[in-house]
């Protein structure tokens, strides 16, 4: 059953955040992750307007998405945004069965 990595970000240092963003695509692919939406046009319909970048990644399974996030490779890449590049909230959401 597919699962979705939903992320919302606020970027503080674009150069540091870009280092993170450049490293992530091959890591996601290694775990079967497929970007469905990333940094495009958005409109906040309800709630606080604290975030300015939104990402949706599809994984074949919930477990693969969690394994990707927990991987050493992803955690090393995430250091660039965690060290002042930005703040991110990430949620894994299991999809509906077919």
Provide a role label for each language-model segment.
Residues 1-54, 59-70, 94-98:
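Short S/T/G/P-rich N-terminal loop/turn motif that feeds into the first structured element of a domain
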Residues 65-93:
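C-terminal structural segments of small proteins and small subunits
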């Amino acid at each position: 059953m597919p699962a979705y990595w939903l992320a919302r970000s606020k970027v503080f240092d674009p150069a540091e955040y870009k280092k993170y963003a450049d490293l992530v695509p091959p890591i996601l692919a290694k775990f079967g992750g497929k970007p469905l939406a990333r940094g495009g046009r958005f409109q906040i319909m309800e709630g606080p307007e604290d975030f300015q970048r939104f990402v949706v990644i599809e994984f074949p399974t919930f477990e693969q998405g969690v394994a990707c996030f927990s991987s050493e490779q992803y955690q090393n890449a995430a250091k660039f945004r965690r060290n002042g590049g930005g703040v991110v909230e990430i949620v894994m959401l299991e999809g509906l069965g077919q």
